[in-house]
Amino acid sequence: MTETQSLELAKALISRPSVTPDDRDCQKLLAERLHKIGFAAEELHFGDTKNIWLRRGTKAPVVCFAGHTDVVPTGPVEKWDSPPFEPTERDGRLYGRGAADMKTSIACFVTACERFVAEHPDHQGSIALLITSDEEGDALDGTTKVVDVLKARGELIDYCIVGEPTAVDKLGDMIKNGRRGSLSGNLTVKGKQGHIAYPHLAVNPVHTFAPALLELTQEVWDEGNEYFPPTSFQISNINGGTGATNVIPGELNVKFNFRFSTESTETGLKQRVHAILDKHGVQYDLQWSCSGQPFLTHAGKLTDVARTAIAETCGVEAELSTTGGTSDGRFIKAIAKELIELGPSNATIHQINENVRLDDIPKLSAVYERILARLLAEKAV
């Protein structure tokens, strides 16, 4: 196998316009390729979402790669320098929607599996891939549903690598070994609509909420810890009024979000918000949505193996970090003993002209292969 195979598979995946939750047979392509080296494929489709669980072997330890074949919309196609679903090599980079997030990662792991199995046909344990077409969307029928199926039948993962783009300045410089939780609130502050010249006959919800708003934004929710930054509270939307300049609004809608560390809990944050609103006499309705709990993989075998593989392949020392947004790791952690995220550069994800460095592609595949070898080979390398 030449090192161009990762590039060619990445191109084949990018050329399929799999805008979430449409898979465009990307998973079929992966299954056909991995079937040749002994992987069994199980399709787990829910609604419009396609998921596939691919596994080679029946014993522990289980090393699983998790990824998604869906991509975000392209945005204005005319702003791209080359068609987003026509993978293009230019200036030492591979351009196309999904190049960084995250079809290149998938391609690199598949080719890593091919090389590893060729060299170690009787390897220890099992290799698995959990692939979904619903990561960029609502994420309701994707990885979370597959995890439920696996959990129900007692199928657990020892080591999981999520192929999200994690590199900042150079391939391998950062490994995500955890993520903050995400808790959102949809707050409706209730008032009484009236003429702006007669405020005594109305109740302005903007005014009644203002003191609580100040306290919410100044509150120190926690101090963070050695793994996580302090919990953050951010308001994303505030809407009120009819558009007229002479009407006191009857309601104010406020949308906000917590990105919270392991120093805080979902229940605790909710209680503190309600206490602040009640303290200021706000009349309100508040709906909550938690899209993920914080999780952490402490430095251990998987992080050590990954850092060694990166050092040997890329010549850099990987930093462990929990920064950034949420990923499907929040679902997989329920059945995975150790979990990290490791992939290409995140500099252009979701952007016009999304791309990865061409010379990073064989390196990433080599990193994945070294991880497999150190975890599953008959003899560690």
From Swiss-Prot:
Reactions accelerated catalytically: N-succinyl-(2S,6S)-2,6-diaminopimelate + H2O = (2S,6S)-2,6-diaminopimelate + succinate
Any matching Pfam family: Peptidase_M20
Positions contributing to Zn(2+) 2 binding: D101, E136, H350
GO biological process: diaminopimelate biosynthetic process; L-arginine biosynthetic process; lysine biosynthetic process via diaminopimelate
Coiled coil start-end: none
One of the record's GO molecular function terms: succinyl-diaminopimelate desuccinylase activity
Alphabetized Gene3D superfamilies for the sequence: Zn peptidases (3.40.630.10)
NCBIfam families associated with the record: dapE_proteo, PRK13009.1
Protein name, as recorded: Succinyl-diaminopimelate desuccinylase
Organism in which the protein naturally occurs: Neisseria gonorrhoeae (strain NCCP11945)
